[in-house]
C-alpha cells in the first residue's frame, strides 16, 4: 500500500436506539501503520461506532470501506474472517479454561495422523502458538510473564486483559480495535 492509501473509511455512519441517536454522520479514516484514539464523553458513541464496524450492531446509514472494498459485517466472526479484531470493554472469557484455550477457542490446532486432521487438539501446538503470540507482543521485554496453561480465573484482571489483546493479535488482523481494554 502507498502512503496515502486508506485501510478503513467509515462515512456518514448513523445508529439509533429507542429514544437515542447514538451516531449522527460519524466519520473515521485509518491508514495502514497508524494508531488512532477516539475520545469523548461517556455516551458519545465511540463504542457504538466500533461495534458497527465489528458487526455487533448494524448501522442505520452510512458506508464502511475496508481494504478497498465496501463491507457490512454481519457478525463478529465475519469481521474476524475479514481482518478486523476487537478487544471489548467487557471481558468475554471462559474462566475455567486455560489462557491458551481462551486464545484459540474454536480454532484449536488439530492432531494430524496419516495426513488427516483428527478431532483431537494438539496441546503442544496450542502451547507453542500461544508462546509465539506472546513473543510477537514482547511480553517478556515488558515483564509480562503469563503461563499459557494458567487457568483464567486465577489471574488478575490486568493479566486477563493482556490475554484478550493476545487473542486479537492471534487473528493476524489488519486492524485491531481496543475498546478501553486497559
Predicted regions and their residues:
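Glycine-rich phosphate-binding loops of nucleotide-dependent enzymes
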Residues: 1-182
Amino acid at each position: 500500500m502507498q502512503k496515502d492509501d486508506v485501510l478503513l473509511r467509515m462515512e456518514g455512519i448513523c445508529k439509533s436506539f429507542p429514544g437515542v441517536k447514538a451516531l449522527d454522520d460519524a466519520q473515521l479514516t485509518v491508514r495502514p501503520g497508524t494508531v488512532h484514539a477516539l475520545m469523548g464523553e461517556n455516551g458519545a458513541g465511540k463504542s457504538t461506532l466500533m461495534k458497527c464496524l465489528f458487526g455487533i450492531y448494524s448501522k442505520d446509514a452510512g458506508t464502511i470501506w475496508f481494504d478497498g472494498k465496501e463491507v457490512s459485517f454481519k457478525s463478529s466472526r465475519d469481521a474476524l474472517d475479514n481482518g478486523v479484531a476487537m478487544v471489548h470493554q467487557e471481558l468475554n472469557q471462559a474462566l475455567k479454561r486455560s489462557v491458551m484455550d481462551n486464545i484459540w477457542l474454536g480454532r484449536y490446532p488439530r492432531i494430524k495422523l496419516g495426513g488427516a486432521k483428527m478431532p483431537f487438539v494438539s496441546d503442544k501446538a496450542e502451547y507453542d502458538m500461544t508462546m509465539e503470540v506472546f513473543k510477537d507482543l514482547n511480553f517478556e521485554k515488558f515483564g509480562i510473564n503469563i503461563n499459557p496453561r494458567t487457568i483464567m480465573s486465577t489471574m488478575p484482571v490486568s493479566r486477563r486483559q493482556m490475554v484478550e489483546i493476545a487473542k486479537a493479535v492471534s487473528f493476524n488482523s489488519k486492524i485491531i480495535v481496543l475498546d478501553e481494554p486497559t
